[in-house]
Structures are given as C-alpha cells and as structure tokens.
C-alpha cells in the first residue's frame, strides 16, 4: 500500500500566491512516483513545479530518487521552487506582487 503524499509546509503559501496573480493551479502531489507537486497555467502556458521547503536544511530539500528520475526523463519543462519568488520566476514573473 502506498503511503499518503507529503505536502511541503510552504505549498499552500506558494499556491495562494500563484492564484493571486491570476494563475490556475492543479495540485499533483498525490500522483507520486516523482511527479512534480503542482501544474500551473499562466498566460496560456503550462508549468510543472516541484515545491521544496526552503526553510529546511539543504539535505531535506534534495529531490528524491523518484523525483530525480522523473525530472531526468521528462521531455518538457519542470522547475523546482523553494519559495514564492522562485515560483514566480518559474512562470516568468520577476518579483512578488
């Protein structure tokens, strides 16, 4: 049996900030198998973002082996964000709004 997907402590903050600037956000963390945490639609573009908690030590922010494999094998865009500003950069916004 698969264990419940963990949600990073900052995921709700990042999702709320993305929605505030007009992005649509679909959580994907429950998919598992290394799939990124969220799918973001913004200005007619799609973005996959893996969320890591920037407040945790670097060793706790590393991609898991499944995430590394998924990122390596995916033939499209995928980003990692540790905070709102990095999530905005991932969708081509330059600063927090």
Task: Name each model feature, range by range.
Residues 1-97:
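Catalytic phosphate/metal-binding cores of nucleic-acid and nucleotide-processing enzymes, i.e., regions
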